Amino acid sequence: MLLLAECRDNGPRQFRLTLLLVGVLVTNVVHIPVAAQSQAILIRAGEIHTVTNGVITDGEILVRDGLIQQIGTSVDAPADAQEYQAEMVIPGMIDAHAHLGLDRSSRSRIPGPFTPEWKAVENLHLEDPMIQVALSGGVTSVIARSGSGIISSGQSVALKMKSTPGPSMILKPYVDLKMAVRPLINLRPGETPQTVMGWYATADDYFRQAKLYLAQKEAYTEGRASEPPEINERLEALLPVIRGDVMVHAHSHYPSEIMMVLRLARKYGFIERLALAHAEEVFPLIDLLSGTSIIPVIGPMMIVQYYNDPEPINLLKELLDAGITASIQTDMSNQHFKDFREYGAFLARHGLTDQQALEVMTINGAKAMMLDDRVGSIEVGKDADLVLLDGHFLDLTADRVERVFIDGQLEYERGEPEQGDRLRDVGPFSPLRNGIGPNDESFAITGAHVFTISDGAIEDATIIVEAGRFTRVEAGGTVPAGIPVMEAGGRVIMPGTIIARAFANDWIGDLKWQVQNDEITEPIVPEMNALYAVDPWFPSYRVNTTVGVTAINVTPGTLNLIGGNGVVVKTPGLDFEEMVRQEPSSMVMSLTSGTTSYWAGASGISVTLESASAMIRDELDEAVEYSRGDPDREYDQRHEAMLPVLRQEVPVLIHANRVAEIREAISIARDYGLRLVITGAVEAHKLADEIAAADAGVILGNSGSFASDIRGGGDGWSSKGPAILSQAGVKVAFFGPGASRRASPIGRLGGEPILNSVWAFRNGVPEIEALRMATMNPAEMLDIGNRVGSIEVGKDADFVVLEGHPFDYRVVPSHVFVDGRLEVERR
């Protein structure tokens, strides 16, 4: 029996769910009856992608009483059936690991080290606005779970996304047991084990006790014991795992961690009901997992690469090609990414078939919940969770989700699309003829469709490159005798993309490098230089080149109030000083609550926006005074670092998210005559006119780790932000991922500048302006627009060749040139 109670917790109204057991186990799937429909629903579509039984062309689906009743080219629908049309229908998509509707409680309120009795279903906030964001993107089911601070942080809940909060959202109250290996290391010393050895010993002992407890209960039930064991809530929570009613969802990253989880699962009988969360390094164990029912739930990092790996490893492709069921996860909490289908497009872009991409977004997630008999595919008898689209389910150039049905009820209906413009046509393409080699210093390309960025498009164009620069860009034209010529066959040529800001190191999975972005000995350190925080041998630089990134502005992080100088580098090479093109490129500062709260915790005193601004202003005042001093004054490293900013030789990048922070950044820049670029900028769209009046640029993002971090999300964020800002005359660009020895820059959605541009396009930014956000805008913000960012005579020959429009999810560069040298060639 499920009761819904309302309560007020000194804040917004929340729905909290309490389960009362009346003769049934909490592990039972909750079936809330769907109100009998007075009308059947008939859905007609050009294509119905069933996932499990192929594609039905010009098909129909009959829905009644919340279930799929018939599927085919012609169904027996009653005359009064309510009809809907769509170009394409797919099953509702499933996020197999998220935190929406919950806080990440295990790091704060859930005591360690092992608390399986904690119930997510009793801690739900079903009015979380991120539920509606997920729904609008076609996500119909989610596993909501607590965080990863302890060995087991309790029981996850499977939810259905609904437009109105209520008990029908509970798909399965106890869907899996959340466990975690690696994230607990160095967390809660004295409360949780600090080694994987301690993890195994602790988990093993609890499961041993639970197995004994179950035997005692069975002995009493069967009359072999006179007394039942004393009720133990913690051990009771493990019994559904041992009995096979729920999955175990274990966070495990390294192969050794995965092997340890497998050993525990074999010993206690849940090896066939095991999901491996994140599992970024599962690839050495693929042969071991093949043929089992273990389900890796990959993400948010989905592609990895290590030094000397010839190519990035698409984990989903490796797993699926080996016959292993694998799903994906967003790991979102206070944010949720609307365009869940973009994960599929991203994976298809890098090796999956469209069908495989659809499987990881639907049926495989259902299998990770042990609910594939109800959701995840379009089959007779299953829940009518359906997504109706006006184009291909992986097309990223528009918000394709028109309607979402859940349990046969229309839960979401899109209004007018944000983007009404069509992309310019490209193609058809004829075969490439002749070629250019990496040692050719001068060459020509003919028959190209050039997106100059600065001056429109040129069809049937000829490009001449000499000594690393463009010397001719024109329609038609002749080619000088004696130089190599590549006939492009109508292919698109555009400038290489530029990452406007990235940190020196991406800490994901590497404890050494997670402390390399911020010098946290004190809050004001302008003398720092990102040049010395980088290892150019990290494979991420090469991967960036392969996807068309030709320049990156590498900066310190965002923990310091003043963090130091950035540096612009070209992506190819191993000698970092040879890669440098602008040093310094920028000075970074931060006014965000994350920065102030960090220093408040470190100092034990209150640090507010006002006091942070005062500290920054004090340093600026001292630097101004220093700049006016005697030329023979005593050298001050800190003040010297500030001089290029004061002279307007480089911009100041001030990290500011909220309205008050952004206004203070504008005030600082105005008072000291600084050239301002606002980074982070979650609420910048609310101040578009003020930012434009300040002649400031905006770099959207709080890191390069996740698409949601780059594009915003959560409170105060708007997907229309880039359109609002650009309409006001503000230059917009994007953060990108930092370097890493293992986390590929294309490993997580959002790592490719061009995908951020297409996101801006489908949310209302004109095509050419969206392309500028990944090319010319960052170049101009960083004072390198005279060298890169567009295809113009005299500029560096940094460009890519594409067999299709750059916003087509299937199109990656076939050729990448940097400084006129061929760096990438895909055959």
Residue ranges and their predicted role:
Residues 48, 52-90, 454-496:
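Histidine-rich, glycine-flanked metal-binding segment
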Residues 18-29:
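Bacterial N-terminal signal peptides
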Residues 46, 61, 66, 86, ...:
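Divalent metal-coordination and catalytic microenvironments
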Residues 105-106, 114-118, 247, 298-302, ...:
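His/Asp/Glu-enriched, well-ordered alpha-helical/loop segment
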Residues 135-273, 400-401, 406, 413-414, ...:
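Polyanionic/metal-chelating signatures
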Residues 1-15:
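N-terminal secretory signal peptides that target proteins for export/translocation
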Residues 46-49, 379-422, 780, 792-827:
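C-terminal cap of metal-dependent C-N hydrolases
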